[in-house]
């Protein structure tokens, strides 16, 4: 919402959402002083209506943020469980690789038995590729989910701060 304030020497346009998003009560007091001494004192009423509208929407917006926060929290927990399972699978396969290497290294190199054991080591290492790729994807997904959760929590907290600030502004207006 924009306020068009006219006074003796000219006029000014105030983008109310951006102006109030700074949350500086001193700036609001100055703006109210300018509005009250201007040719358009009805801007104060427009400002009051805008703030009341924002305050009325507070509960609905908070509920929406809360729903998203709960959903993202559950998704993060599930993703962390999946990562733990994948890491466990990788550790089991790595144990198999170690055992196969130990058995292979107990024989002379380039003998028939050594070659058979070496084939086993290669099989285990091949089996490691898929879980490692999966783990990489899961970590990326977890990072994205945590980022989305953080953004919603930030919006939730910002909304609470806005409500407190709007209460102060309403006290200044009345």
Please identify what each model-predicted range represents.
Residues 1-42, 48:
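Leu/Val/Ala/Ile-rich N-terminal alpha-helices, chiefly Sec-type signal peptides and the beginnings
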Residues 24-31, 43-48, 54, 96, ...:
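Short amphipathic alpha-helical segments that mediate assembly, nucleic-acid/protein binding
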Residues 35, 39-73:
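Short, charge-rich amphipathic alpha-helices with coiled-coil/heptad character
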Residues 55, 80, 118, 136-139:
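Asparagine/serine/threonine-enriched low-complexity, disordered tracts
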Residues 64-128, 159:
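Extended alpha-helical coiled-coil "stalk/arm" regions
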Residues 120-159, 166:
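Amphipathic alpha-helical coiled-coil segments
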Residues 171-174:
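Short acidic DE-rich linear segments
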């Amino acid at each position: 919402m924009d306020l068009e304030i006219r006074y003796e020497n000219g006029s000014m346009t105030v983008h109310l959402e951006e102006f109030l998003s700074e949350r500086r009560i001193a700036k609001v007091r100055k703006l109210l002083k300018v509005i009250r001494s201007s040719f358009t004192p009805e801007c104060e009423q427009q400002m009051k209506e805008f703030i009341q509208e924002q305050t009325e929407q507070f509960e609905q917006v908070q509920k929406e943020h809360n729903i998203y926060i709960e959903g993202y929290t559950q998704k993060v927990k599930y993703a962390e469980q999946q990562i733990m399972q994948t890491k466990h699978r990788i550790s089991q396969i790595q144990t198999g690789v170690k055992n196969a290497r130990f058995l292979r290294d107990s024989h002379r190199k380039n003998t028939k038995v050594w070659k058979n054991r070496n084939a086993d080591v290669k099989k285990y290492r091949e089996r490691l590729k898929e879980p490692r790729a999966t783990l990489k994807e899961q970590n990326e997904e977890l990072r994205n989910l945590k980022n989305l959760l953080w953004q919603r929590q930030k919006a939730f907290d910002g909304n609470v701060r806005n409500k407190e600030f709007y209460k102060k502004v309403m006290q200044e207006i009345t």
